[in-house]
Amino acid sequence: MRKRALCFVLACSTAICIAQNESRFHSDLRREGEALKECGAISRVEDCGQTVFLGQPLHIAVGSLAPDNGVAVGLALVEHKNFANEWRTSFNVDAGATMNNSWRAGGYMKAFKLSGGNTYHVAPLFYLYSQSISLNRVDYFGLGQNTTPLNHTTFGFTENITGVNAAIPISVHGQAPIFAIVAEINGRFPSVRRGVEKNIPSIDSLFTESTAPGLNHQTAFVQPSEGLRLFPALFKDGIRLNYLLQFQQFFGPGDSVYSFRRFNADFDHEIPLSVLSKKYYNAGRAAVFPHNGPDGCTSTGGENKAIPCPQVSLTRKLEGSIHLRVFLSESFAGKGSSVPFYFSPTIGGSDLDGTHMLGSYPDYRFRGPDLLLFRGSVEHSLGKLPIGALFSVDEAKVGLRRGDISLDHFRHSFGAGLTVHAGGLPMISFLYTRGGNEGTHAIANISPALLGSSGRPPLF
C-alpha cells in the first residue's frame, strides 16, 4: 500500500510539474484541441464552427482577395506575449489561396504599451508586417474618366509590402485623446505580368508604356508617409468623426521616372440612428487603432481561451447608423515622371483592397492618379439577427491631372444589400448596385480580416 501511495504521489507530482512547465503556447494548443473534440456533438455545432474559424492559436482563415480573384482559404497562427514593462505584443502569420491560383501570405506583429501618464491615455501602437500577394486577374481599361469597355484588358500583379507604421494618440490637459500622429515606412516590390484570361485580352495587346506607365518595367519603392488622424465624438456622441490627412512619398531608386507623391484626405462621419444604437451599436464598433492583427481578436476578451473572439449572438436591440464619407486623393509627379498605373486608385465595383466605390460599374472600371468620392450609406439590423440591411449612394470621378477633379461630371451608383456581423467572424456583404450606363453589378465580399481587427497593408 505504501508503495502504491508513494507511486500515486510521485505520479501526481510529475503531472503537476509538467503542467507547471507547460508553455502558454502549448497550453493554448491543448485548450483548442479540447474544444475541437466537442465537434462531434450536434448541440455544439456553433461552438465548433467558431473554434475552427476563430480559435487560437490556429484556425482556418477565410477572406476575399482583390475582386475577380475569389475567396482565399488557408491557415492562420495567432500568438501574443505580455511583458513585465507593460509592453504587449501580438503575432499573426497566415497564408491562403483561391481557386484561380491567386494567393496571399504574410506575417504581422502589433506592439503597444499600456496607456498612462499625462502624455497619452490611449497606448502608442506599432504595426510591423511583411505581406506578399499574387493576383492572377486585375482589369485595366486605360487611364481617365472617359475610357470605354471596348478597351477591357487584364494583367497579373504580384507585390510584397514590408514595413512598419505607428499611431501615437495625443492627450491634451489629461483628457481622452481625439487626435493622433500617424506615420509609416514601407518597402514595396511590385511586379506586373501578362493576363491569363481566355476571353479577355492581355494588357500588353492594347496598351503600351505611354498609355500604361510602368507596364514595361517595375521598380522597387521606398514609401514613407506621415499624417494626422482626428476622431472626436460630437453632440453627446451623436456624430463620430474619423478624419485622416496623409502625405505619402513613393521613391524609386536613383532618378526613377516613377517616383511621385500623394495627398489623401478622408473624412468619415458616423451617425447612430437612435439612443439605443449609441449604446449597443457603438459598443461593438472596431477601435480606431485596434491592437489585434488581421487574424486575431484577443483584446476583445472572452471566457473561453480557445475562442477569445466575441461569440456569435443575436442583437439585443435594433441597431443602425448613417455613414457619410468624402475622400480625396491627389498625386504629384515631377517633370518627366509619371505615376505607375498599378499604383493609381480605381473606382468601379471594388478596388484592389476590396473597398466599394461606384459599385454599379465593373471592378477597376476607371483608373487615375487623382480621385474624388462622395459616399452616403445607411445600415440597420434586421430584427434581432446579426444581419443588416445596407443602402448606399456613390458619386465619384478620377482624373489625370489635379484640374480634372472638379465638382461636375460625376459617375453615380446606387446600391442595396445585406451585411453579416457575426461575432468576430469576418464581415460578409452582398450588394446589388445600379446606376450609370453600363448596367448593374452584384458584389459579394468576405472581409480579409476578422471583425474588429486591424486591416492589412494597402496594395497602392
Residue ranges and their predicted role:
Residues L10-A19:
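Hydrophobic h-region of N-terminal signal peptides that target proteins for export
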Residues I18-L125, V182-E184, V192-I239, T355, ...:
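Outer-membrane beta-barrel initiation region
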Residues F25, R31, K37-S43, D204-P386, ...:
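C-terminal outer-membrane beta-barrel translocator/porin domains of Gram-negative envelope proteins
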Residues G63-L65, V93-A97, G116, L150-G156, ...:
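Outer-membrane beta-barrel proteins
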Residues S64-D68, E79-K81, A95-N101, A111-K113, ...:
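Transmembrane beta-strands of outer-membrane beta-barrel pores
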Residues L75, V93, G107-M109, T162-A166, ...:
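Membrane-embedded beta-strands of outer-membrane beta-barrel proteins
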Residues G96, I133-L143, T148-G163, R194-S202, ...:
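Extracellular/periplasm-exposed beta-strand and loop segments of Gram-negative cell-envelope proteins
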Residues L114-T162, R325-T346, I428-S447, F460:
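Outer-membrane beta-barrel translocator/channel fold
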